[in-house]
Swiss-Prot record:
GO terms for biological process: DNA-templated transcription; regulation of transcription by RNA polymerase II. PROSITE patterns: ZN2_CY6_FUNGAL_1, ZN2_CY6_FUNGAL_2. This is Uncharacterized transcriptional regulatory protein C777.02. Its main location: cytoplasm. The keyword ATP-binding does not apply. Gene3D superfamilies: Zn(2)-C6 fungal-type DNA-binding domain. CDD domains: fungal_TF_MHR, GAL4. GO terms for cellular component: cytosol; nucleus. One of its GO terms (molecular function) is zinc ion binding.
Length: 612
């Protein structure tokens, strides 16, 4: 049996049984071709350096010819040398280049913006109100380091990241990152040393190997050290991506304050790069700043960051940084797939998962994030309280209908019914999409469980929450049975915590039969959190808080003794400050009706808070 899928199955993106011929080729009456495995083939350092030098020579010569007068081109061609010691740096501006610049005095950018060129792959953006001048300047910056220590299982950690956590980190384009990773140079745009270590820190948390899981903090430190060495003052897209990954890591480990700061730094650095504006409108000397392919990649990165910003703000109950009204970037389009990265992709189970593209998934999450952002502004923002509870209840009903409309308008291959929901739990991507939808419904309706009013089709906040919790359980069960909880994505941790918080609120006013069902829900989510507590410290710390809360309701919440151990995790060596524990207490303590504004920001924490 072959180790690789045949070319026909790769192009069709279908599972290959790896026989010769495979079943798919036999049925289609096609020749079953197995391409050679060149992934481990590496050229010598001398050979690579020679090619890089020759490429730099060609680029330098072409740059001179492009701006030179016609009469000077023959002399430039005569002076071409094919030696391998030429510098890769571009020539300084000559007199004829300066004359061409003066001739083109009118910028093609409509608004009075400034672009500061910081090397070949970085352009810093200044808006119309900036105090900086509009001249295009060039400032040197150190190249991103491409050296990676071989003492860590880098490849395996990256595989874990892209297989299990990728759905929540779509601000990274997998194909471009891996292409540059396997073709390393000092001039990468989408791969850097600090970003590699940041992805490894998250990826190894999805490992079944406890030794590899324990290396996550070491990867985090290596990522931060490499980022500091490169320089936070040197804005780069991989640095922004690295900061955002490290922010997610800190939040998942229970350090919400540190994670929030890192995420904010990432978004600010992205705005410094102008990633919220369409680069197709940018020209320097009548030459586009970026190519169409680069513009498409920047679109993927921006909208991935937008989704991450809304998601982090939503789970922490805080204001967003990126606004849809501030961007001119078009929605993400499908980008070409690369062959040879099958080891970094999970074979999608079910008919629904096999028919979705990453761009399609991202655009659906973006539209869902737009609703989420509106909920934060019009339901949970402090200024909305002055309009009274009646208007807020109207907004709750409005956004419940918006969520229903989003669900009804899903494409046929992604629209789910309750009987089909288990199929969506077989794919990390679709599981994220569904859980995010139910997470929003829970957080929107949970504070209003005790309020009564006129609702369409009996869509009371209580009924919506009970229904959503059941759907969350179906998805998690399907994920556990098909993929296992040791590869749990972060969204499942958040879904369990929010579901438990909602269940505790549902105890008030519940009938005896409902109380029994709610007790079983607590047991289920405790069981899941216990299983994944060795991978994510946020789950580990939440268990004790849930148990303490459950005793207040006399639920006697326990999981099966043979499967779950609710004792403190002795292997957990992470040190958390008291302020971080207080953040977690907010997840479940609805007695804190007067939340700490210094800790929670302008919005109340949607993980836990007062009932209205």
């Amino acid at each position: 049996m072959n180790k690789l899928s045949c070319l026909y199955c790769r192009r069709r993106k279908i599972k290959c049984d790896k026989n010769r011929p495979c079943h798919n080729c036999f049925v289609a009456k096609r020749e079953c071709i197995i391409a050679g495995d060149n992934r481990k083939k590496r050229h010598t350092k001398t050979y690579v350096e020679a090619l890089e030098s020759q490429l730099a020579n060609m680029e330098s010569t072409l740059a001179k010819i492009k701006v030179a007068p016609v009469e000077k081109i023959p002399s430039l061609l005569a002076g071409i040398s094919f030696k391998d010691h030429l510098s890769a740096s571009l020539p300084n501006k000559t007199s004829y280049e300066q004359a061409d610049t003066n001739a083109t005095s009118k910028s093609l950018v409509d608004l009075p913006v400034s672009l500061e060129v910081r090397g070949r792959n970085t352009v810093t953006f200044y808006g119309p109100t900036s105090i900086f001048g509009t001249s295009f300047t060039s400032s040197p910056r150190p190249p991103p380091s491409a050296s990676i220590e071989d003492t860590y299982p880098i490849i395996h950690c990256l595989q874990l990241f892209f297989k299990w956590q990728y759905a929540q980190f779509l601000f990274i384009h997998r194909e471009s990152f891996l292409f540059e990773y396997f073709h390393r140079s000092n001039d990468n745009m989408y791969c850097s040393e600090h970003l590699i270590y940041a992805l490894c820190a998250i990826g190894c948390r999805s490992s079944e190997d406890s030794l590899l899981v324990n290396q996550a903090d070491a990867f985090y430190k290596m990522a931060w050290d490499a980022l500091e060495s490169y320089g936070l003052e040197n804005s780069h897209i991989t640095s922004a991506q690295c900061l955002l990954c490290l922010g997610f890591y800190k939040i998942a480990m229970g350090n919400t304050s540190h994670g929030w700061l890192l995420c904010g730094m990432a978004f600010r650095m992205g705005q410094d790069l102008g990633f919220h504006l369409d680069p197709r409108d940018w020209h320097i000397n009548n030459v586009p700043v970026v190519s169409e392919e680069q513009a498409a990649l920047r679109s993927r990165i921006y909208w991935g960051c937008y989704v991450a910003d809304v998601f982090v703000s939503f789970i922490l109950g805080r204001p967003t940084t990126l606004s849809k009204s501030d961007t001119s970037v078009p929605t993400s389009d499908d980008l070409p797939d690369f062959s040879g990265i099958e080891d970094f992709m999970l074979e999608r189970g079910g008919a629904h998962a096999s028919s979705i593209t990453i761009s399609q998934l991202l655009n659906l999450i973006v539209s869902l994030s737009n609703i989420t952002d509106a909920i934060l502004l019009n339901v949970f923002a402090p200024y909305s309280t002055k309009y009274g509870i009646d208007l807020r209840l109207q907004n709750v009903g409005k956004y419940n209908l918006e969520l229903m409309k989003w669900h009804f308008e899903l494409p046929p291959n992604l629209s789910w019914k309750k009987t089909e929901l288990r199929d969506f739990g077989q794919s990390p991507e679709l599981c994220f999409l569904c859980l995010y939808f139910f997470l929003i419904r829970l957080c929107l309706n949970r504070p209003f469980l005790s309020k009564k009013g006129l609702y369409v089709n009996d869509m009371t906040p209580r009924n919506i929450c009970i229904d959503s919790i059941e759907d969350v359980k179906v998805l998690i069960r399907a994920y556990r049975e098909n993929l296992g909880l040791h590869h749990t994505p972060l969204i499942i941790v958040y879904a369990c915590i929010v579901s438990c918080s909602t269940v505790f609120m549902l105890f008030d006013g519940a009938t005896p039969s409902e109380i029994v069902a709610l007790e079983q829900d607590i047991k289920f989510f405790l069981h899941v959190l216990t299983k994944i507590s060795k991978n994510w410290d946020l789950a580990s710390k939440s268990i004790n808080l849930i148990q303490k809360k459950s005793t207040m309701y006399d639920t006697n919440a326990r999981a099966n003794d043979t499967d779950v151990d609710f004792s403190n995790d002795k292997q957990n060596t992470h040190d958390f400050q008291i302020s971080h524990d207080e953040n977690l207490i907010q997840l479940f303590n609805d007695e804190s009706n007067f939340f700490n504004l210094n800790d929670l920001g302008d919005f109340q924490s949607i993980f836990g808070g007062p009932q209205f």
